[in-house]
Each structure stands twice: as C-alpha cells, then as structure tokens.
Amino acid sequence: YRVHLTGPLRQAPPPLAGGSGVEVEEKPAPPPLGLERAFGWDRWDQAYLEALAKTGNEPIGSLGYDGPLAALNPEKPNLSEFFKETVAVVTNPAIDREREVEHFSTRTLLGRRPLPDGRGGGRVEELLLPIVLEEDQALAEAFGTLTLSEVRARFKTKTLVPQFTVEEGLLAGLKRLEEEAVKAVEEGAEVLILSDREAFQGGVWIDVGLAVAAVNRALMKRDAEGVALRRRTSLLVHSGGVRNLHDVAFLLGLGAEAVAPWLMEEKARALEGRKGLAGVLEALKKGLEKVISTMGIHE
C-alpha cells in the first residue's frame, strides 16, 4: 500500500566544513620494522600485542613452549628470555585473581622513600598501575598513572641512556652507567629514567634488564648517614625492548618502580588507535595481578 506524506521533507544537515561530520581517529604510522628487530621483537610479539590491543586480554594459547631455549637460540634473545616465572601457589584452594582481585594491588610509588623516623622524605606520587605513558594525559589519568612529561614536571629527574661504545666495551659501559646513576642521585635526582630512545645513535644498546640490575645494585651505596642511595630515588624504565607482560614483570622484579614501554605504545596506537592503547593497559594490569596471584600468598 501507499502512504502519502504531507508537509515538507526533512532535509539532511549540510556537511561540516572539512569533512563528513563523523570524527575518525587518525592512527599514526607504525614504527620502522628495523627498530622492532633491533629491540628483539618477533612475529609472536606482534601477534601478542594485536590481541592485547583488540581484546584487552592476553591471548589464550596451548600449554608448553616449543621454541628454542634462550641459550640455544641462534638469534640474539633479550635478557628476559633467559628467565622464567616461578609459580608458588601455597593456598588451598588456589587464590583466584578473577574472584578475589581485592587481594592484589598493582600500585607503586615514585619519588623518595622516607625513613621510618621521617628523615629523607620528599615528593611521592602513587601510581595505581606501574605503566607510564609517553602521551595522552587523559588516558593515563583514567588508569591512575602519569605521562612521562608529568613525571619530569613533578620530580627532579635525570635521564640515562643504557648504551656503550665499541671502544669502551660492555663492562666499561655498565661501570660508567653505574657511576652516572650514583652521581645523579647524590645531586638530588628523585627519579632516574633509563631511556633507550637514543640508544642506537652513536652507541650499542645495553639490554635494559642488565642496566636496571646494575644501577639498582650501584645505588645500594650508603651515604654519610649510613642510608642507601636507593631510598632517595625511583627507577623508571623507558624502553622499546619491553614487548610483553613477562618483560614488564621482569623489570619490576629487578627493581624498577615503573615502566614506560614506548615502542609498545606506538605500535598499539598504530594498530587500534587510542582504544588499542587502553586495551594494552587493561591487559597488562590484569596480567600483573595474575603474576602476583602465583607468587605465594597465604594467611
């Protein structure tokens, strides 16, 4: 049947100047493939990150690992691949991250750690997630963390580059990095940023795991009052070599207070835009809670 309409037809609104009126997020270009290879990324890391960005969860895979052990890998593996998680479930029944999540906290503190008597205190910021972003302050605030620029604005920071020259060699480069860290803290640095953004410009990259371990050990040096320099500062790892949850947990276990995985952030934005980065943060938060749940918690 026919329906006769009366009255003027509603006209479509005129298009907005410069576009269709529908705001579409422009995704940045992916980082160069050579940069990914230099930091040890492979196809598995790419597929893993895609799952995080699209679903906000870690991918589900089969049990077991059928790849070569790190010591037998013909390619140069990152240091974290030589380490595996030790599961120590001592509760019966096993504690459940999904239903007993209130037992787990991913909070961390940036800044000086005061002594029990109050001496040596300074500015301290609590992060609900030990992941610092390069940009997007609103997204960082939504996850209870900070951007790198906010860290630099709120604290006295010192940036150290984990690299060595061919002439000096790895051991001498590590020794120099340790000395630079000690000097920076003695001069008042509240946050040490180990950044490999410029690591391949005129030098050879030092694996950030090795750099964190060396700096953390060097800062155990005590001052005139007998207090370790480590209490005066926090370690923030700004690295392109952070590829997955295991890398994040590995660096935190070595002594870092927070991690800024800049290459992972760039790749997530290139894949799914801002939504993809939010998915990565959510997945890493869940993953860290899962790691904590297997460390051995008992009443």
Regions found by a protein language model. Give the residues of each.
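Extended, highly charged accessory segments
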Residues: Y1-L177, V182-E186, I193
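Phosphate/diphosphate-binding loops
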Residues: Y1-R2, A214-H298
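Hydrophobic residues within beta-strands of alpha/beta enzymes
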Residues: L192-I193, V259
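Glycine- and other small-residue-rich loops at beta-strand/loop junctions that grip anionic moieties
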Residues: L72, R197, V204, V237-G241, ...
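Structural motif
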Residues: E187-G188, L254
